[in-house]
């Protein structure tokens, strides 16, 4: 069962993916063994999918776009599989609200708009709503 300690562990990891189990134990005043056991449980239950970084693409001469996608319901499953197969799509989310999916697209500055346009070529994608990231605030 997911509890307060699990939430605190996840919050610490979210803020600093490099934090050690020792540091987590110290900050939460729990044993290292408890931290290790909780992390194993959170991974086994699929709550923690992986550990990753948040890159500042602009500092590397790259561009990042957050793209809202309007996808026809009858094509949704295949369209999202096709979109997820692109190596320049870093993340893809099924969402509710104004869009049916959100894609995080990363490419060099010269081709980012072409990559966004390529999403419109996927069968079932009716429209794209790109927002180009200027800077990471948090």
Segments the model singles out, each with a brief description of its role:
Residues 1-138:
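A compositional/biophysical signature of low hydrophobicity enriched in polar/charged and small residues
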């Amino acid at each position: 069962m997911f509890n307060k300690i699990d939430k605190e562990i996840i919050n610490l990891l979210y803020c600093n993916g490099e934090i050690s189990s020792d540091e987590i134990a110290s900050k939460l005043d729990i044993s290292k063994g408890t931290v290790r056991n909780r992390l194993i449980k959170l991974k086994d239950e699929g709550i923690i999918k992986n550990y990753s970084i948040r890159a500042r693409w602009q500092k590397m001469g790259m561009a990042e776009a957050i793209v809202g996608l309007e996808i026809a319901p009858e094509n949704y499953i295949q369209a999202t599989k096709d979109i997820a197969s692109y190596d320049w799509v870093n993340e893809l989310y099924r969402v509710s609200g104004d869009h049916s999916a959100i894609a995080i697209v990363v490419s060099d500055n010269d081709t980012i708009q072409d990559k966004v346009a390529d999403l419109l070529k996927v069968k079932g994608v009716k429209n794209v709503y790109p927002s180009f990231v200027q800077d990471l605030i948090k």
